Amino acid sequence: MANSFERIYAVVKKIPRGTVATYGQVALLAGNPRWARVVGYALHANPDPEGIPCYRVVTKDGRTSPAFAFGGADIQRALLEADGIEFTEDGRVDMAKYGWTGLG
């Protein structure tokens, strides 16, 4: 599992400021599209929150995680807003606008 986590962390480190990725997208880019839950476990165990920006990972519909390991959904939202990401009226990230393509 440790090797899986390292692959996940490598992907998350690439998510640029001002964009977000989904759990499923990180799983796919880490090598296994069925790892969405593993991505969640890895992010919860993140050994370096400042170096691995796990707050940039959201659900497929743009929602923050209610179980965000480093302070809850409100902290995750504040971190994303500090990155320049805006939220819709219903509290979601506009994935068409802020979703990372995984390229570059």
Predicted regions: what they are:
Residues M1-G104:
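Nucleic acid-binding interface residues in structured DNA/RNA-binding domains
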